[in-house]
C-alpha cells in the first residue's frame, strides 16, 4: 500500500478505495498469502480487445510469420507510444527467453533500431523534441549494454543515416551479441505508425546479409 501511495501521490484512504475498486473489477489481485497486489487477469481481456481493434496488426501477422519462417530469426512489430516503441507482435526462435515472447514490453525510441527508423521518418523539429525529452527519462530499468548509444549527437547521426538508407540498425545495444535491423511502417500521410524489426546473432549475421534475407521474405 505504501508503494502505491508513493507512486500515485494519493493519501492512504484514497489509495485503499482505489485498490478495492480495481480488485472488485478484476484489474488487481491480491498477492501470495494475501500480501500486496499483482495485475489481474482482466487486463488480458483489455489486451485482447486492443489487439483485435487494430487492423494493422491483423494485416501484418501473416507477413511477420512468413519473415520468421524464412529467416529463422526473431521478427517483431512495434507500435509508437510517445517516447517508446511497444512490442505488439513477436515471432520468436527456439533460443528466445520467455520474456522476449511477450507483447507489451516497451523500449526507448532513441535506443532501438525500431525507434530510430520511426524518428527517421519524422521532421527534424520532432526528432529534436524526442531527443530533448528522452534525455530526461529515467533509464534505471531500461536494458542496456556498453555499446548502447546515449549521446544525442550520435543518435541524431544514426537517424540521419536511417533516412538515407531507408532502414535503421542497432548492434548489441539492447543485448550483447544481437544485431537488429528495422524499417518504419507509414500511414497514408507518410507518418510512421509502427516499425518491423528483425534480430539476429552477430556471430551468424552481418547487416547486409540480414537485410537481404528479410527483403527476400518480404517479397
Where are these regions (language model features)?
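N-terminal helix-turn-helix
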Residues: 1-57
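Solvent-exposed beta-strand sheet faces enriched in polar/charged residues
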Residues: 31, 38-40, 78, 88, ...
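All-alpha effector-binding/dimerization core of bacterial HTH-type transcriptional repressors
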Residues: 48-96, 121-124, 133
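Short, solvent-exposed recognition segments
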Residues: 97-174
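Extended hydrophobic
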Residues: 147-211
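Conserved small/polar residues in nucleotide/adenosyl-binding loops
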Residues: 212-219
Amino acid at each position: 500500500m505504501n508503494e502505491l501511495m508513493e507512486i500515485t501521490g494519493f493519501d492512504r484512504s484514497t489509495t485503499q478505495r482505489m485498490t478495492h475498486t480495481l480488485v472488485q473489477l478484476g484489474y488487481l489481485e491480491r498477492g501470495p498469502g494475501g500480501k500486496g497486489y499483482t495485475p489481474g487477469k482482466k487486463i488480458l481481456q483489455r489486451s485482447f480487445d486492443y489487439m483485435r481493434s487494430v487492423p494493422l496488426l491483423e494485416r501484418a501477422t501473416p507477413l511477420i510469420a512468413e519473415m520468421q519462417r524464412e529467416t529463422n530469426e526473431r521478427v517483431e512489430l512495434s507500435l509508437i507510444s510517445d517516447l517508446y516503441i511497444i512490442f505488439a507482435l513477436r515471432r520468436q526462435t527456439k533460443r528466445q527467453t520467455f520474456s522476449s515472447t511477450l507483447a507489451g514490453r516497451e523500449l526507448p525510441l532513441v535506443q532501438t533500431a525500431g525507434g530510430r527508423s520511426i524518428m527517421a521518418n519524422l521532421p527534424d523539429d520532432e526528432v529534436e523534441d524526442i531527443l530533448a525529452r528522452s534525455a530526461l527519462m529515467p533509464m534505471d530499468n531500461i536494458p542496456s549494454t556498453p555499446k548502447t548509444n546515449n549521446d544525442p549527437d550520435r543518435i541524431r547521426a544514426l537517424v540521419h543515416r536511417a533516412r538515407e538508407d531507408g532502414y535503421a540498425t542497432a548492434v548489441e545495444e539492447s543485448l550483447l551479441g544481437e544485431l537488429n535491423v528495422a524499417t518504419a511502417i507509414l500511414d497514408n500521410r507518410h507518418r510512421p505508425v509502427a516499425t518491423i524489426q528483425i534480430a539476429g546473432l552477430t556471430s551468424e549475421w552481418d547487416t547486409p546479409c540480414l537485410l537481404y534475407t528479410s527483403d527476400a521474405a518480404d517479397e
